[in-house]
Amino acid sequence: MMSTDQHIQQNMNDNSNNSNNSNNNNTNNNNNNQSVNVNVNNTNNNTQTISNLSAGLKSVSLTDQQQNEVNLNLLQQQLHQEASTQQQQSRITQFFQNQPTEGFTLFSHRSAPNGFKVAIILSELNLPFNTFFLDFNNGEQRTPEFVTINPNARVPALIDHYNDNTSIWESGAITLYLVSKYLKENGECSLWSNNLIEQSQISSWLFFQTSGHAPMIGQALHFRYFHSCPVPSAVERYTDEVRRVYGVIEMALAERREALIMDLDVENAAAYSAGTTPLSQSRFFDHPVWLVGDRTTVADLSFVPWNNVVDRIGINLKVEFPEVYKWTKHMMQRPAVKRALRGD
């Protein structure tokens, strides 16, 4: 199965990175047998070429004029594409020629939830970073420079300028790299753990998010909005799978909430256990709960960007998965999450 970002990002039009010089064939003039020659050798004479071709159109027959107008439009499109490609290649080439010596560079895209997932982790850890938003329409993700740091030509990818410009790709791998590095350098990391058992629990949810949660939402979005022709069965299949995934998370959070209420609301614990008083009446019913332990970890935060777009496939978290909704709402209120989602 393709990676999640591919299903969202490949629906954008990729243009080729390199343009070859083009030659337009001569068109004979019926009256004076003159020809309009188009020979594009380099960017500097392209403007004159278009002017000559436009002038020549005035003296040819209607049929030839129509053909030359088509040729002119194609040439203009090619020149525009060539100029855009040169500009984008220059942008990414300049970055790699003058890389920072400190901090991190995150390669992302404005519509890539996995890129924002990494941005959230960087922001939560208060690590200095800059985001380089790639332009997929101009093929920046396929440039030799970028493929060097991510052979899969997808986002996200991260460069650690503190560590000899080490590059890491895939959002899960980047997340583990960041929290492990932070733990090693600072002795503790609130988003991770010193405890091996907790580390395994956090990793389980992190891998569940990267292998089940994100890909299913990505596929549902793809078949709902971007596929070349309607496939209702695919939309239904992936949307149902997203609901199944959220059912797993909802159950885990509900169990965490019940344990929290029974622990903190001691005077009413017996009534809750007997079922005479519903848990929803507890003053702790809206208290934050987390997937692992009593604090926010990367296990929780990795879900945020995708939870933020799931309404686009017709899933209402507040109605269908209330615990997931409250959990997401608490995380969305965190300053670091707000900064990351804004693209700061």
UniProtKB/Swiss-Prot annotation:
It holds the Pfam family GST_C. Residues 102-186 form the GST N-terminal domain. One of its GO terms (biological process) is protein urmylation. Residues 9-49 have a biased composition (Low complexity). PROSITE patterns: GST_CTER, GST_NTER. Keywords: Nitrate assimilation. One of its GO terms (molecular function) is transcription corepressor activity. Residues 1-49 are annotated as: Disordered. Transmembrane segments: none annotated. One of its GO terms (cellular component) is cytoplasm. The keyword Cell membrane does not apply. Residues 195-344 form the GST C-terminal domain. Gene3D superfamilies: 1.20.1050.10, Glutaredoxin. Homodimer. PANTHER family: GLUTATHIONE S-TRANSFERASE-RELATED, TRANSCRIPTIONAL REGULATOR URE2. Plays an important role in the cellular response to the nitrogen source. URE2 gene plays a major part in the repression of GLN1 and GDH2 genes by glutamine, and is required for the inactivation of glutamine synthetase. URE2 gene product may catalytically inactivate GLN3 in response to an increase in the intracellular concentration of glutamine. Belongs to the GST superfamily. This is Protein URE2. It comes from Candida albicans (strain SC5314 / ATCC MYA-2876). The lineage of its organism: Eukaryota, Fungi, Dikarya, Ascomycota, Saccharomycotina.
